[in-house]
């Protein structure tokens, strides 16, 4: 007997989940809305209705990803290809897991899900049918099903009829691993992957982003091995078909800056770049909402309506939302299907080749200029450096801005060595004749953050070509080409030295930051190509 138009208990038994009598298969948004607001639910399962029509949920103590609890099974599939945390100079979160410990964790999750009423969502990761992953998500929590329905690409009825999953995600958020110490793991919580079984297991953390970023890590493994760029970036396209991609870590402005009324959105966070052009991995957006206002970010604000899902925001008794309240976390979020943004690429989230590549950084030191034009070598250097300030609350335990270097602007999600991503990106850029820029959305010498208004004007100047035609001067030490003036931008802020009481103050901070860049890049100098790029970085 097929249950709910899709799945039999016998199919779940193949994954180790038994005694399931009620499967809610690919639930509609209306059904999820009813399920989330069910008054009989308790704890983190229960949603709250807000005045904007969206349901808000609380993800518990995990208000961001837990990178220290991420593991990958080390076996014949992955041993010689994965970028391991315990090999080489590079620092990453890809900790090896033995097949035996994997079986134990799998047993914990399948035991948790067995005998329960389960939500099963089948969806695609990747807008290109040739390279997409067909993913099956299994959870006992309605809002987690809602999250993946928002964030991944929703199949048509015809596609569902022939759906065969390439990857299984079993979310056992309610279970933990009591044997973690004996197994040499970080804690009782776990986010584990097995490339041979094509499966992800989640235990202990309720944070929805573990499912989203888990599949991103898998695409980051599979695509570059086929010569396809896999990128932690947003992307949009202009009226003339000109495509721009925006790289950057969480909170640097990827979603905000790519959501532009003058351009159609391809996607806000994860993309591939193949022989046909740039394509989205996702079917939704996951926007930060801290200090969100309708005036500053109208597209995102207006996307928060029925079917959107808010996380960790403060909801007052009357259902209104206090977007300024970061007492729970600075990493408050909303997920929504991409069609909640009016100006999107339809019907499929993909476009042609990118001609503008923008690296977004939030410089906590106030040293880097608001914008600079990069040479080919500087493009590779700054891509591999991936400098930003880690912004409050996107990972557990980080509440103040601290400088960080994250290879390819997404080291946490890289499955291969960073140089492999740089090589693929450079090949794609060269073939398309693309130009790269470094844009600082962070702070300057005044201690204030560069305004969204100024940053938007800078992005406009990049996209309409006026920056390429502008006169430039060179910022010492970092050797960056800075425009002398740009339309709509306060000229005084273009040279970061002007925002300090004295040039010596900038010089002092610049030397500190330059040393951090140089020390960080040392890990790439063990190859001739990496050593050759040192000259493109800052010099003391």
Swiss-Prot record:
Record field: catalytic activity: oxaloacetate + ATP = phosphoenolpyruvate + ADP + CO2
Record key words, sorted: Acetylation, ATP-binding, Cytoplasm, Decarboxylase, Gluconeogenesis, Lyase, Manganese, Metal-binding, Nucleotide-binding
Chief place where the protein resides: cytoplasm
Protein name as it appears in the record: Phosphoenolpyruvate carboxykinase (ATP)
Protein function: Involved in the gluconeogenesis. Catalyzes the conversion of oxaloacetate (OAA) to phosphoenolpyruvate (PEP) through direct phosphoryl transfer between the nucleoside triphosphate and OAA.
Binding sites annotated in the UniProt record for substrate: 65, 207, 213, 333
Pathway: Carbohydrate biosynthesis; gluconeogenesis
GO process annotations (BP): gluconeogenesis
Cofactor: how and how many bound: Binds 1 Mn(2+) ion per subunit.
Top-level taxon of the source organism: Bacteria
GO MF term list: ATP binding; metal ion binding; phosphoenolpyruvate carboxykinase (ATP) activity
CDD domains: PEPCK_ATP
Cellular compartment(s): Cytoplasm
EC numbers on record: 4.1.1.49
Quaternary structure annotation from Swiss-Prot or TrEMBL: Monomer.
Pfam families: PEPCK_ATP
SUPFAM superfamilies membership: PEP carboxykinase N-terminal domain, PEP carboxykinase-like
A single cellular component GO annotation: cytosol
PROSITE patterns named in the record: PEPCK_ATP
Residues the entry annotates as binding Mn(2+): 213, 232, 269
């Amino acid at each position: 007997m097929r249950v709910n138009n899709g799945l039999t208990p016998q199919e779940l038994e193949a994954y180790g989940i038994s005694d399931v009598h009620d499967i809610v298969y690919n639930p509609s948004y209306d059904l999820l809305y009813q399920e989330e607001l069910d008054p009989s639910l308790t704890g983190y399962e229960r949603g709250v209705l807000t005045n904007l029509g969206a349901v808000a949920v609380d993800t518990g103590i995990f208000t961001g990803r837990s990178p220290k609890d991420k593991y990958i099974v080390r076996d014949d599939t992955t041993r010689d290809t994965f970028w391991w945390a315990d090999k080489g100079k590079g620092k990453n979160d890809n900790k090896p897991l033995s097949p035996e410990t994997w079986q134990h964790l799998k047993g914990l999750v399948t035991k948790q899900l067995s005998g329960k009423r389960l939500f099963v969502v089948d969806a695609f990761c990747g807008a290109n049918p040739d390279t997409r992953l067909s993913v099956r998500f299994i959870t006992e929590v309605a809002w987690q099903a809602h999250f993946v329905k928002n964030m991944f690409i929703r199949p048509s009825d015809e596609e569902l009829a022939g759906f065969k999953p390439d990857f299984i995600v079993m979310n056992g958020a309610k279970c933990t691993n009591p044997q973690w110490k004996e197994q040499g793991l970080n804690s009782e919580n776990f986010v584990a992957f097995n490339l041979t079984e094509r499966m992800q297991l989640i235990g202990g953390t309720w944070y929805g982003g573990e499912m989203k970023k888990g599949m991103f890590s898998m695409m980051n493994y599979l695509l570059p091995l086929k010569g396809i760029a896999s990128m932690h970036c947003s992307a949009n396209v202009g009226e003339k078909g000109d495509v721009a991609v925006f790289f950057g870590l969480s909170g640097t402005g990827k979603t905000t800056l790519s959501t532009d009324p003058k351009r159609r959105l391809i996607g806000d966070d994860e993309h591939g770049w193949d022989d046909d052009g740039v394509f989205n991995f996702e079917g939704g957006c996951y926007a930060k909402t801290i200090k969100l206002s309708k005036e500053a970010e109208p597209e995102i604000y207006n996307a928060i309506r029925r079917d959107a899902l808010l996380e960790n925001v403060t909801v007052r008794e009357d259902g209104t939302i206090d977007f300024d309240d970061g007492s729970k976390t600075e990493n408050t979020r909303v997920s929504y299907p991409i069609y909640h943004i009016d100006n999107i690429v339809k019907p499929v989230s993909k476009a042609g080749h990118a001609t503008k590549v923008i690296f977004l950084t939030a410089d906590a030191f106030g040293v880097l200029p608001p914008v600079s034009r990069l040479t080919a070598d500087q493009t590779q250097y700054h891509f591999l450096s991936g400098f930003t300030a880690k912004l409050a609350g996107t990972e557990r335990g980080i509440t103040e801005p601290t400088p960080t270097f994250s290879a390819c602007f997404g080291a946490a999600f890289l499955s291969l060595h960073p140089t492999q991503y740089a090589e693929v990106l450079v090949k794609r850029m060269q073939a398309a004749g693309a130009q790269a820029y470094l844009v600082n959305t962070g702070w300057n010498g005044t201690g204030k953050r560069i305004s969204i208004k100024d940053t938007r004007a800078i992005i406009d100047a990049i996209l309409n070509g006026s920056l390429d035609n502008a006169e430039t001067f060179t910022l010492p030490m970092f050797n960056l080409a800075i425009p002398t003036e740009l339309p709509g931008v306060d000229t005084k802020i273009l040279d970061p030295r002007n925002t300090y009481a004295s040039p010596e103050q900038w010089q002092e901070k610049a030397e500190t930051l330059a040393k951090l860049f140089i020390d960080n890049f040392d890990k790439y100098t063990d190859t001739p190509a990496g050593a050759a790029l040192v000259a493109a970085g800052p010099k003391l």
